[in-house]
Amino acid sequence: MPATTASPRETAERFLSAAIGADPGDMADCYAPSVVIEMPFAVAPLIPARVETTREELRERFRAGTATRRYKSLGEVVIHETADPGVVIIEYELRGEFTQTAESFSLRFLMVLTIRDGQIVHSRDYSNPIAGAQVIGRLPELIAALSKDVTAINS
């Protein structure tokens, strides 16, 4: 019997489960070998607004994050199917804790995922850049980057 390809909804559900799994690198298995990730609210140069990357680079990035934080559970999750059968929109909350202090945190996301053959080929990730920078320990860098932007605008 031939293997069936996961639907976009099933792929999104697998991604969310992997986010709180024992090995966050497993999230990378939800992505195609080459993928485009866009983060429209990202603040360059801290985080690029668009990245063309590979599944293995994502795996390394996801695993590296466990040095400072672990995602423990999901809050509210809503998966929206769209008129395009290859696109789903997921809204979710990731709850976790910092590895050194066990202090809790929560991050909310909205992602527009384009999925082909059961793998994410394109992602548009919308999240709060301030909360994200705080969780990854880069809030001072974000403030500096924003200050430079404001200075350039006011010049």
Where are these regions (language model features)?
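Short, low-complexity N-terminal intrinsically disordered segments enriched in polar/charged residues
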Residues: 1-29, 33, 141-155
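Short N-terminal micro-motifs specific to bacterial/archaeal maturation
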Residues: 2, 18, 49-50, 123
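A beta-strand edge to alpha-helix "cap/lid" segment located at domain peripheries
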Residues: 2-4, 67-155
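A solvent-exposed, acidic/Ser-Thr-rich amphipathic alpha-helical stretch
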Residues: 5, 25, 32-85
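Hydrophobic alpha-helical core bundles mediating ligand binding, dimerization, or RNAP-core interactions
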Residues: 12, 16-19, 31, 39, ...
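Hydrophobic pocket/interface hotspot
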Residues: 15, 27-28, 35, 54, ...
